[in-house]
Design a protein with these regions (language model features):
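N-terminal positively charged helical leader segments and presequences
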Residues: 1-63
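RNA substrate-binding interface of SAM-dependent RNA methyltransferases
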Residues: 62-155
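Active-site/ligand-binding-proximal alpha/beta "capping" segment
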Residues: 148-190, 196-201
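Structured adenosyl-cofactor binding patch, chiefly the S-adenosyl-L-methionine
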Residues: 185-226
């Protein structure tokens, strides 16, 4: 079924005016019929009947997502990687993707897609993977990540083998992945001084997108264990 996005709450019987970008999408995929699904950022999924640019809400379900909230912070990658990260982490059920400028980042925050573009990418990813709530995408400072980190709720992916393999418990809600060039001594020391657990994956050198997906999968799998 065709899935469309609207940034408002749904009530049965209400009529929603579809945003212009959703109408453009609808015109490219519609193959007859007037039924579709509408989703928003509140976890609501509505069955709707479409007439012109209006959607009449016939039924509303609430689908909480994700089951295991996890925020993933990634050292700023090249702009071309942003779309891939948003799509992949959306499919994995991540709550939030935060980009931060690391000492060895090869790009700057100013080169990130605009907030509007990031939002459209998150909506498109949610549409494709049938995720009710689009991924939240933010930009943060490295220092704020350290301040938000704790022994119990944070895991840092580290390319150095001596980081070991920290156990991931169900209470972990923040995964921090370094930039393409790896952590600087200053950044690594900041996490060590804060006693934040570090985790090393025994693999060859990973690109930042691969590292983020692999570490996220590891965390989600271990969060699900009894």
């Amino acid at each position: 079924m065709i899935r469309l996005y609207a940034d408002q709450r749904f009530e049965v019987g209400a009529v929603v005016a579809l945003p212009p970008e959703e109408m453009r999408y609808l015109r490219t995929v519609r193959r007859g019929g007037h039924e579709a699904q509408l989703f928003n950022r509140a976890g609501q999924v509505a069955e709707v009947t479409i007439e012109d640019n209006l959607a009449r809400i016939e039924r509303v379900d609430h689908n909480p997502w994700p089951l295991h909230p996890l925020r993933v912070a990634v050292g700023l990658p090249e702009p071309s990687v942003v779309k891939q990260l948003i799509a992949s982490l959306s499919e994995l059920g991540v709550t939030e993707l935060s980009f931060f400028k690391a000492d060895r980042s090869q790009a700057s925050l100013s080169r990130l897609p605009s907030e509007d573009k990031q939002d459209r990418l998150a909506v498109e990813a949610a549409r494709q993977c049938e995720r009710p709530i689009p991924l939240r995408v933010t930009a943060v400072e490295f220092e704020s990540l350290v301040d938000a980190s704790s022994v119990a709720t944070t895991v840092v992916l580290d390319e150095q083998p001596d980081a070991g393999s920290s156990p991931v418990g169900s209470e972990v809600n923040l995964l921090v992945v370094g930039p393409e060039g790896g952590w600087s001594a200053r950044e690594r020391d900041a996490f060590i001084q804060a006693s934040v657990p570090r985790m090393h994956l025994p693999t060859p050198i990973l690109r930042v997108a691969t590292a983020a997906v692999a570490a996220t999968s590891w965390c989600l799998a271990h969060r699900s264990l009894p």
